[in-house]
Amino acid sequence: MEDMAKKDGVIEIEGVVTEALPNAMFRVELTNKHIVLAHISGKMRQHYIRILPEDRVVVELSPYDLTRGRIVYRYK
């Protein structure tokens, strides 16, 4: 994700959505085999980008809580 603006202290990692949960939450298995709970970023909600199980996504993780994240990109 070279063209996206980098935020300080945020970890970006790829993963695969394994399960869709209520309230636009998703369970994502990261490339390092960890499983995190993630929600959709505001820009993705604004543009009605749909996320389905088995989609490859980019997740932003905060260094303070590595079990929760934000989905910021869905690969086509």
Curated annotation (Swiss-Prot):
Superkingdom assignment: Bacteria
SUPFAM superfamilies associated with the record: Nucleic acid-binding proteins (SSF50249)
A Pfam family hit: eIF-1a
A cellular component annotation (GO) from this entry: cytosol
Major location (coarse): cytoplasm
Coiled coil spans: none
Annotated localization: Cytoplasm
Keywords: Cytoplasm, Initiation factor, Protein biosynthesis, RNA-binding, rRNA-binding
GO molecular function terms listed in the Swiss-Prot or TrEMBL record: ribosome binding; rRNA binding; translation initiation factor activity
Residues annotated as domain S1-like: 1-76
Subunit structure and binding partners: Component of the 30S ribosomal translation pre-initiation complex which assembles on the 30S ribosome in the order IF-2 and IF-3, IF-1 and N-formylmethionyl-tRNA(fMet); mRNA recruitment can occur at any time during PIC assembly.
HAMAP family: IF_1
Family: Belongs to the IF-1 family.
PANTHER family the UniProt entry points to: TRANSLATION INITIATION FACTOR IF-1, CHLOROPLASTIC (PTHR33370:SF1)
Role of this protein: One of the essential components for the initiation of protein synthesis. Stabilizes the binding of IF-2 and IF-3 on the 30S subunit to which N-formylmethionyl-tRNA(fMet) subsequently binds. Helps modulate mRNA selection, yielding the 30S pre-initiation complex (PIC). Upon addition of the 50S ribosomal subunit IF-1, IF-2 and IF-3 are released leaving the mature 70S translation initiation complex.
Protein name: Translation initiation factor IF-1
Organism from which the protein derives: Renibacterium salmoninarum (strain ATCC 33209 / DSM 20767 / JCM 11484 / NBRC 15589 / NCIMB 2235)
Lineage: Bacteria, Bacillati, Actinomycetota, Actinomycetes, Micrococcales
